[in-house]
Amino acid sequence: MGQSMSCGSRPEHGIFASVQCGDIITIRRVMATEPSLLNQTTPYDRHSVLHVAAANGQIEILSLLLERFTNPDLLNRHKQTPLMLAAMYGRISCVKKLAEVGANILMFDSVNRRTCLHYAAYYGHANCVQAILSAAQSSPVAVHWGYARFVNIRDDKGATPLHLAARQRRPECVNVLLDSGSLVCASTSVYGSPGSTPLHLAARSGSIDCVRKLLAWGADRLQRDASGRIPYVVAMKHKHGACGALLNPSSAEPLVWPSPLKFISELNDEAKLLLEQALMEANREREKTILKGTAYSLPSPSFSDTDDNMSEVSDTELCCICFEQVCTIEVKDCGHQMCAQCTLALCCHNKPNPTTSTVTPPVCPFCRSTIACLVVAQNNNNNNEKSKSLDDVVVVDREAGDVSSSKFRKHRRSINLGEESSSFMGLSTIGSFGRITGRGSGRIAAENELMDKPIL
């Protein structure tokens, strides 16, 4: 590993060069005339042709080779599988192909005892993270080891994939992992500082996007590491003022995604996107308030105090709670409708405990029936009986989770959505660190450096 290979070198070197550059004609010829060459490995790191094909994203050659090799989990010098290298380099087609033929997603390397999921999260390949997690749900791992256990699998320093993603400033991976059941408040043994949570590591790296996402999933700002430090102290120690401002225990609590609610986990993609965008907007408002007048003010999506489309809709389409936003969410089976912002206020009036698996679902503010399902509202101007309008304006009592009559008619932000941080979808991601290429060690040279990738 770490040495470029020329087609003019020895035959076993030439086969690796052919794989690397995608010369499928040569590979077919070798398979027909000199198949023993396919059993060769590179001189130092002992990469097989499967490793080289996977790392270089040569999906056609990889597929061809997998027809010959009965074992897709060949090991190199560091006990890394082809699937690990595909995940490391973000070769999504190779990741999917290897998973399809039964590559073991539960193999551990000998460098840091990491799996392919650790590699994908560490290097920021969210699509590979998702593909591996999808494979885990349908593989024997889910049956014999447990899907939740796999998502939160630890390396030899006690780091889960979520810890690595947060430390390496990978907000998209953080989002996928949290959405798949990663424990937001899990502590490391020795990775980073002993006892670090993902929030400690995001604070240390200064990734405000990761901080936002973790807070939105209920990360505890007051949880301490083994040295007694809360994430705020870690952020300020490393001079990440914007992160520190959001993590300051004296600042307003963020609005938290109500993941413990069963109907939230069952949302279809369209309804989930609407609610996530509402959460993003609410927490952006909270950020603007916290950072106002500081040197850390951040750009936020621009929007006016009144919706541009207000003049184009009839009163019957407006949310009967805030009278400001168009109804976009419908409660099944009663059919009552609300805007996404008021729906979140109803579901999130209490911050969920990340360790709680079940909570009492909220009730519809109009008919008091228990909410079991939320879908995107299908507004129809000609069907006024579905509007479920009220004679009085109703407001959500966030403390009691109740609804009462009132003359309240404020902007949606007055429903205290802005009290509480985290954009969810559509946020710009922090640029990844430059990759350090080495001569094949595959190790982490220091705590604050990227793991060396092999040059293949």
Curated annotation (Swiss-Prot):
A zinc finger (RING-type) spans 319-368. Pathway: Protein modification; protein ubiquitination. Transmembrane segments: none annotated. It catalyses: S-ubiquitinyl-[E2 ubiquitin-conjugating enzyme]-L-cysteine + [acceptor protein]-L-lysine = [E2 ubiquitin-conjugating enzyme]-L-cysteine + N(6)-ubiquitinyl-[acceptor protein]-L-lysine. ANK repeats lie at residues 45-74, 78-107, 112-141, 157-186, 194-224. Pfam families: Ank, Ank_2, RING_XB3-XBAT31. GO terms for molecular function: transferase activity; zinc ion binding. Gene3D superfamilies: Ankyrin repeat-containing domain (1.25.40.20). One of its GO terms (biological process) is protein ubiquitination. Its EC number is 2.3.2.27. It comes from the Eukaryota. It is an enzyme of class 2 (transferase). Keywords: ANK repeat, Metal-binding, Repeat, Transferase, Ubl conjugation pathway, Zinc, Zinc-finger. No E3 ubiquitin-protein ligase activity observed when associated with the E2 enzyme UBC8 in vitro. This is Putative E3 ubiquitin-protein ligase XBAT31. It comes from Arabidopsis thaliana (Mouse-ear cress). The gene is XBAT31.
